[in-house]
Curated annotation (Swiss-Prot):
It comes from Shewanella sp. (strain MR-7). The active site is at C73 (proton donor/acceptor), C183 (proton donor/acceptor). It is an enzyme of class 5 (isomerase). Keywords: Cell shape, Cell wall biogenesis/degradation, Isomerase, Peptidoglycan synthesis. Substrate binds at D9, S10, Y41, G42, N74, T75, T184, H185. One of its GO terms (biological process) is regulation of cell shape. It comes from the Bacteria. It catalyses: L-glutamate = D-glutamate. Its EC number is 5.1.1.3. This is Glutamate racemase. It holds the Pfam family Asp_Glu_race.
Length: 272
């Protein structure tokens, strides 16, 4: 098996990023690693987040011989990337909230960032706003509940729209024309978010930009012959999780997505 692309997240949100990468690289092999034992990441202390993520990703990279790692989690990307890059010898791609394109797209210059509490409070987020949206009024909204709602939707096919409307009410009242989805779970709720917020609010995420970056990096590290060989073989997809068990609904969804292997990875702090 050729070296896979390893996509990592705390839960199923990173599947939205993996889907964008597969559009550009449909024949590549993929590993999806989700640390659902510690979900949601937005409520973890910084050092706990760093040490756990680095140990887990390093373990799976060594096992799968991954060619590249995509940290498809905004919360983890804001704090884990330096330590991860210092540990691994392969390229590591993180997620950056789409603040810059949001500022460029906004006509009212009133934009919002919807993310986890962890991402909202990071200094990195404020640096992005200062650098790319200095001419905009930017509202920040942090929610861990939306992460769990996205997980529930995928696992059960159900979503409490009344509760979603309550969670989003501060955003509705903020009178924005562009909202950045600063958590990879949130594109899973795109249709429902749009329904509550209305067509006057444009929703932006970073999935497409990440996919283009991954394709560029792989092209730099592979020969033309290797690229051609990848294009001529069927894609193999493996999923790894850290919780003791996953629901039948989630397992069924992963199989429907094309994953041929679902396996629990035992690591520190994974007994929840």
């Amino acid at each position: 098996m050729s070296q896979p692309i390893l996509v990592f997240d705390s839960g199923i949100g990173g599947l939205s990023v993996l889907a964008e990468i597969r559009k550009l690289l449909p024949h590549h092999n993929y590993c999806y690693l989700f640390d659902n034992a510690r979900l949601p990441y937005g409520e973890l202390e910084e050092q706990e987040l760093i040490s756990g993520c680095v140990a887990l990703i390093d373990q799976v990279v060594e096992r799968t011989h991954a060619a590249i790692v995509v940290v498809a989690c905004n919360t983890a990307s804001t704090v884990v990337l330096p330590a991860l890059r210092a540990t691994l010898s392969i390229p590591v791609v993180g997620v950056v909230p789409a603040i810059k394109p949001a500022a460029q797209l906004s006509k009212s210059k009133r934009i919002g960032l919807l993310a986890t509490p962890g991402t909202v409070k990071r200094h990195y987020t404020y640096e992005l706003i200062s650098q790319f949206a200095d001419d905009c009024h930017v509202e920040l909204f942090g929610s861990s509940e939306l992460v769990l709602m996205a997980e529930q939707k995928i696992a059960t096919g159900q979503l409490d729209m009344a509760r979603l409307a309550q969670v989003l009410s501060p955003i509705v009242e903020a009178d924005l024309d562009v909202l950045v989805l600063g958590c990879t779970h949130f594109p899973m709720l795109r249709d429902e978010l749009q329904q509550v917020l209305g067509k006057g609010v444009t929703l932006l995420d970073s999935g497409e930009a990440i996919a283009k970056r991954v394709k560029t990096l792989l092209a730099e590290t592979k020969s033309e012959q290797q690229v051609q060989e990848d294009a001529n073989r069927d894609s193999v997809m493996q999923a790894f999780y850290t919780k003791a068990e996953i629901s039948e609904g989630l397992a069924s969804m992963l199989v429907d997505c094309g994953f041929s292997t679902l396996e629990r990875i035992t690591t520190i702090n994974s007994n929840r």
